[in-house]
């Protein structure tokens, strides 16, 4: 069934193995690059490669994952072994990989956002303009490594803010005709629903809420009119609504273009999505905690014919996926000039697998590493769909190198030895140079070669005398009070 490989023997893994799947890595254009065996353990994804070390992606470090037909792909965070990137694998059992990964996520109490519900900007928190339509289970799953109290399995599964994303963001490995992409309304208002798995989780969720992101102050005064820009929080029985302000990039763009002359003290830290081009139509994002009844209706699907969609089926939902881990700079990035040497060494350059549009648009990115969320910023500037074509990513490597070899043996270290002069220290040696400050003049003339190589001289007679003196001191039985003034008595 599967179209993938094995780390040691390609035929050693059966086609119907419950946790191991034969996969083939592909790039943005669908070109096969290498094969391996994808194994799903209780805590991480493991890719076994031929003649190479296994590559591991912990579930807590996965940002999102999904499948389409025979293609399974996921996005890894910066704390993974491979760093930040999007990886796509071709496999006939892609749906089984997705379902198994989703079950493992839920067993490990890792939040999965599956059911987007749309609330318009001007609606009351308790009034929905559109029916609550959960996403089917075969759609994209999104994972975050955040818990309400810092411990997995306790409290409600809320989402913690991570970074802003774009309205054109969709699943990286799925084509333009993907059936699993979410559709957004005209105003780009989004609701992210957290559904507890049981009634016990829901009862616990009423007393424990996720801390607000930095820079969002709850219960702001509502005296600024309909065009207020500050983030707001509305607490209602059974739901919490967060209204976010514009992003710093959007404020800067509006200020440069002169579309919006004044803003009401926008916050410095916010996580809302890309704003529309007009200031009065500022989008608002709503987060709602819904009971388990919504989960039971998971068979519903959002359709463009619903009221309020206006037939905009080409619009993609802005998928806000969050994680509360501090970002780390990506590691194990391979450069294009290093790939030639790897191809000659292994004899198979297609073993170096690549993430599907794994980003790193070095030539087009103009922000600091800590402000770079994903490669979707380049998609905004080019007004193209995700993923970004390779021809437009001039500074990024084409193939992601998975060759994580163990470091070789360290070079031998240089050892320095102390030269001990055993000859020439007899009784005929003058006793004059007893002063430590005066240099020992006879040494350079008698042994010039040895003196140039050595950096220390040991007086053996003096060492033996001091050792004998210490041995002759009276032993302390523990009854005498010893100080530095009364312990210097020398034996007779």
Swiss-Prot record:
Keywords: Lipoprotein, Membrane, Myristate, Phosphoprotein. It is a lipid-anchor. It is found in: Membrane. SMART domains: IRS (SM01244), PTBI (SM00310). The keyword Cell membrane does not apply. Its main location: membrane. GO terms for cellular component: cytoplasm; plasma membrane. The keyword Membrane applies. PROSITE patterns: IRS_PTB. Binds NTRK1. Binds FGFR1, NGFR, GRB2, PTPN11 and ERK2. This is Fibroblast growth factor receptor substrate 3. It comes from Homo sapiens (Human). The lineage of its organism: Eukaryota, Metazoa, Chordata, Craniata, Vertebrata.
